[in-house]
C-alpha cells in the first residue's frame, strides 16, 4: 500500500450525494453544500494518509515492527531531563560561577589545598635556603680571607725574604762606611802639614820647625779612638738598628 493510494481513496460520502428534489440542478444551494461536504471529507483522508506515511517513515528509524503490523503511534521525543543533565541551567551555572569558585578557591583564585601545600613547601624550603645562604657566606668569607692573606704575602714577600740579621749587617756596614769616610778625611788632614785647622790639630808641623817640633798632635773629636774600638762601633750600629727597626 502506498501513501498516494491512501490519499486518493474516495470516501463513501463522495459517491452518494443527495440530489435536491426540485429538478437536480447543479447550481442549486443544496448541491453546493453537498460538494463542500465532499471536499472536506476528501481533505480529511488525505491528511490522515500523510500522517500515516510520516509515521511509517519515522518507524523506519526505529526497530522494524512485526510482519503485517502497521505503525499507528508516533514515537515520542526523548525526555528533557537528559539534556538538562548534560547542560546545566542558568541557575546552576550562576551557582558554579559564584559559589563554586568561592568554595574551591579563595579570593586570589588559588585552591585551598594548593595554598596549604605551597605554605608547607615554603616552610620546608626556608631552612634549606637559609643553610645554603650560610654556606655561601662562609665560602665567600673564606675566599676573602685567603685573598687578603695572599695580597699581604705578596706585598711583604721581599721583606720576609731578608732576615733581621741581614738588615742589621747592612746598617752596620753603612755606619762603618760613613765613619770610615770621616776618619779617612781626618787622617789625610793630619798627615799633611799645614792643611789641618786649629780646631782639629793643636799644632802645625811646618818646614821651619823641623824635626825638633815636640808639639803633640792630638785629635779633640775622638773619632779615631771610637772607630778603633770595635765594641763602641757595634753599639752605635745596634742603636741605629733599634731606631730603624723597633720590633
Curated annotation (Swiss-Prot):
Residues 1-67, 80-110 are annotated as: Disordered. The keyword Cytoplasm applies. In the embryo, robust expression is detected between 16.5 and 18.5 dpc in lung, kidney, and salivary glands. In the developing cardiovascular system, it is detected in lymphatic and cardiac valves (at protein level). GO terms for cellular component: cytoplasm; extracellular region; nucleolus; nucleus; plasma membrane. GO terms for biological process: negative regulation of DNA-templated transcription; negative regulation of protein import into nucleus; positive regulation of DNA-templated transcription; positive regulation of viral transcription; regulation of JNK cascade; regulation of Wnt signaling pathway. Belongs to the MDFI family. This is MyoD family inhibitor domain-containing protein. The lineage of its organism: Eukaryota, Metazoa, Chordata, Craniata, Vertebrata.
Amino acid at each position: 500500500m502506498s501513501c498516494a493510494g491512501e490519499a486518493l481513496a474516495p470516501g463513501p460520502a463522495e459517491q452518494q450525494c443527495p440530489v435536491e428534489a426540485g429538478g437536480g440542478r447543479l447550481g442549486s444551494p443544496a448541491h453546493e453544500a453537498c460538494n463542500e461536504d465532499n471536499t472536506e471529507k476528501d481533505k480529511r483522508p488525505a491528511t490522515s494518509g500523510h500522517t500515516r506515511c510520516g509515521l511509517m517513515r519515522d518507524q523506519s528509524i526505529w526497530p522494524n515492527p512485526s510482519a503485517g503490523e502497521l505503525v499507528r503511534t508516533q514515537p515520542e521525543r526523548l525526555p528533557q531531563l537528559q539534556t538538562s543533565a548534560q547542560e546545566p541551567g542558568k541557575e546552576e551555572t550562576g551557582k558554579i560561577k559564584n559559589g563554586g569558585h568561592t568554595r574551591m578557591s579563595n579570593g586570589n583564585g588559588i585552591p585551598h589545598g594548593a595554598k596549604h601545600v605551597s605554605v608547607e613547601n615554603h616552610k620546608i624550603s626556608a631552612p634549606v635556603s637559609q643553610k645554603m645562604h650560610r654556606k655561601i657566606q662562609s665560602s665567600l668569607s673564606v675566599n676573602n680571607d685567603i685573598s687578603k692573606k695572599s695580597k699581604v704575602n705578596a706585598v711583604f714577600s721581599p721583606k720576609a725574604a731578608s732576615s733581621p740579621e741581614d738588615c742589621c749587617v747592612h746598617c752596620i756596614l753603612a755606619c762603618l762606611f760613613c765613619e770610615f769616610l770621616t776618619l779617612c778625611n781626618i787622617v789625610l788632614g793630619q798627615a799633611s802639614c799645614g792643611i789641618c785647622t786649629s780646631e782639629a790639630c793643636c799644632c802645625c808641623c811646618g818646614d821651619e820647625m823641623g824635626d825638633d817640633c815636640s808639639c803633640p798632635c792630638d785629635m779633640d773629636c775622638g773619632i779615631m779612638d771610637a772607630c778603633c774600638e770595635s765594641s763602641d762601633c757595634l753599639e752605635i750600629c745596634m742603636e741605629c738598628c733599634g731606631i730603624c727597626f723597633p720590633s
